[in-house]
Amino acid sequence: NEREKDSYVNQDIVPERTSLNVHFKVPSAGYQEMFSQMEADGVISTRGIKADAFRYGELVFDVNSAYFYNHGGYDFAKQFYTDAYKSAIKIVGGEQYILSAVMHADERNRAMSEALGEDVYHYHLHVVYIPVVEKEIRWTKRCKDKSLVGKVKETIMQVSMSKKWASKP
């Protein structure tokens, strides 16, 4: 999503427009490195996660190209996706769980461009995040102070692709 390659399979990407892509959150490193750092810092926990479990999620906010074309193009799309990014922060539980967020402004809508006889671009927002759920860790029967058994010991943000993240129509 960061457009760091020299060429792409998608022939509708216009490299000269890549500078118009809007980064709401630029990754500070590779996703795996960022994940490991967040785990080391205690921001997230992988306690109980299976080795083959998904560790990343992606939200894609995508609206018909005609909508932006009819409402002001690039500037309108920037404002629209600024608001969408604010929604993404709420959806994932906080900006600290977002690794990357970029609005692509460099993809040409071929069909619409040909129909109108001018370049029309397809604006959309990619948000890569770490899916987490709040989990309460409780004192167990092995605790020396029996009055604590069953009470919340700590609350962690556990990496999880639980039903919370299931796609809904």
Set out the residue ranges of the language-model regions.
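N-terminal nicking endonuclease/strand-transfer module with a His-rich metal-binding environment
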Residues: N1-P169
